[in-house]
Amino acid sequence: PDTEAVLSIHLFGHPARLDKIRTVCEENDLLLIEDACQSVGTKYMGQVTGSFGDISVVSFGHKKHIDAGGGGAVLTDDSAIAQDIRRAEKNIPRRDDAYISELFDAYRDIYYAIDDLKELATEPHALYESLPEAFHDLFQYGFKSKWIPNIRNGLNSLDEICQVRQNHATIYRNRLQHPKIVHPD
């Protein structure tokens, strides 16, 4: 009864079963939020991921399909939701690039230190979970117009980017053959 939305995550280019999820959302008057950060360009039932939900998010961060150096986008066709998003975006602080770079380096160093020591820690997941709060500024900063050319280039090259990723996936699938390995469809 307290649920207002369903967050559907498409992981490693594999779309969630959006037809079924969408039906549940419609039957229960729930918003569908799609996390399409790792599935930009992927199609499900002939439609691109990120276009099924009431709200969708995509990332332009490091190693994503469109790597603009950071940031992301919230997408919606609903004008009321779009207005709320624009209002909220105005309150996101603008951060200095050098500060963000310094934070990112420190975050990465601590993340991998935890990873190296996780066998010794009694609750390593708690250490990982503490990072977003400790590095709050790294996860919330305003959009930078300097990212626009990289985003535009990524959108224009999206088919090629997706093909390269598909080629890599095929290589992994072909080389990682073992009875205990189950590859996704």
Where are the model-predicted features located?
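PLP-dependent aminotransferase class I/II
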Residues: 5-9, 14, 18-20, 27, ...
